[in-house]
Amino acid sequence: MRMSQLFGQTLREAPADVEVTSHKMLLRAGCIRQLGTGIFSYLPIGWRAVEKISAIIRQEIERIGGQELLMPVVNTADIWKDSGRWDVIGPELTRFKDRQERDLVLAMTHEEAVSDLVRQEIRSYRQLPRLVYHLQTKWRDDPRPRAGLIRVRQFIMKASYSLDRDEALLDLQYDRHFEAYHRIFARCGLDVLAVKSDVGMMGGKVAHEF
């Protein structure tokens, strides 16, 4: 397709209030446009880039045994109340009611939904280990969205959920993911450093950021 036929336009200059270089480049190249605070539309050329990255992620996670699924963006409040995070997480978790006055949430993460699914599908330890993952639209009402796509309220996140018989297998799966992420970054042409980080509300023994 010719550039002249693409939906969306390139910009000679980024808006004056845009400070981060990556944000400026994405706007000027016609990859994204802002709809609201921390909310962006991906134009065709930007979405093609997202799909190429997603394909690399899928290949590398399925290489270590991952099976892709898709979870609902809207979750029932019951599963969040059962986990205790309904009361722990503040206004970042968007809560609302349906027409039947039932409490619902826009999922900012999917541990609760996956746990509910596992209770239905896994009946014996003999079915383990299993590894499921998704590339999912999520919503977190961040109080300070900034820096373009670096810190947004609606975002696409890849998450894996490792179901293991014991902690040793869980540690092995963590190591496999660690290596898979390095391969993903390498295939995207990125040099990265892995830094140990706080586990945060996810819990666990160890976490890394790249």
Regions found by a protein language model. Name each.
Residues M1-E209:
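TRNA-recognition modules of translation machinery and tRNA-sensing kinases, especially anticodon-binding
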